[in-house]
């Protein structure tokens, strides 16, 4: 059994009510046969009403898990407990309107083929961490990763985590960090 969880907070620091605008992009990609497996969690009555119009299940997100300080893990733990979710859970953030249902299906196949317990997506880096420095006082800096390499060809391959699609076994949540990964997480590449 797979549950598709869509987190949709009401407040946004950058663009007011952005999730109201983004919700339709995600909702329209989900096939009708999956509607009964979709749970929209929000503290926004408008989004919850729209979700019900689609036939999705709804969850009223607590103030704690909807705050700016709460982590993705806090939210996922809450919905797993509140809704008594068992099995696989796929989280679909609204901030990826270019995500397709094909992407979701391919990620789930990848997850199952590797017999994974958690999955995030990965993206290419724009800037390698070997050329990043911590900013110090007096216009100085300190390497984020200590090394003495100058040729980029010698740098280890790196990627950036991405929550375009996150999949996890319900009982894995306690073993994940605040960003939903650990040493056993697998990473799915979406171009």
Regions found by a protein language model. Give the residues of each.
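N-terminal glycine-rich phosphate-binding loop and ensuing alpha1 helix
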Residues: 2-41
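A structural signal for isolated positions on well-ordered beta-strands in alpha/beta enzyme cores
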Residues: 3-5, 37-39, 90, 119, ...
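Short beta-strand/turn micro-motifs composed of small residues
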Residues: 6-8, 42-43, 93, 122
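Histidine-centered beta-alpha loop that forms part of the nucleotide-sugar donor binding/catalytic region
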Residues: 9, 63, 123-125
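Short phosphate-binding loop-to-helix
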Residues: 29, 45-90, 98-106
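Short, high-confidence coil segments that cap the C-terminus of an alpha-helix
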Residues: 35, 85-86, 115-117
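Conserved core of the sugar-phosphate nucleotidyltransferase
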Residues: 74-75, 97-184, 189
């Amino acid at each position: 059994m797979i549950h598709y969880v869509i987190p949709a907070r009401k407040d946004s620091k950058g663009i007011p009510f952005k999730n109201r605008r983004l919700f339709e992009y995600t909702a329209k990609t989900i096939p009708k046969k999956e509607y009964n497996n979709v749970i929209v969690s929000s503290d926004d009555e408008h989004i919850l009403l729209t979700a019900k119009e689609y036939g999705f299940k709804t969850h009223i997100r607590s103030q704690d898990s909807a705050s700016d300080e709460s982590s993705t893990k806090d939210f996922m733990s809450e919905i797993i407990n509140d809704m008594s979710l068992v099995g696989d859970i796929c989280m679909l953030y609204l901030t990826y309107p270019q995500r397709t249902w094909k992407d979701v299906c391919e990620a789930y196949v990848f997850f199952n083929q590797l017999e994974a317990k958690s999955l995030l997506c990965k993206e290419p880096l724009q800037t390698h961490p070997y050329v990043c420095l911590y900013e110090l006082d007096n216009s100085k800096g300190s390497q984020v990763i200590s090394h003495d390499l100058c040729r980029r060809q010698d740098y280890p391959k790196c990627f950036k985590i991405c929550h375009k699609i996150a999949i996890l076994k319900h009982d894995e949540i306690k073993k994940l960090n605040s960003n939903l990964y650990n040493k056993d997480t697998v990473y799915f590449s979406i171009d």
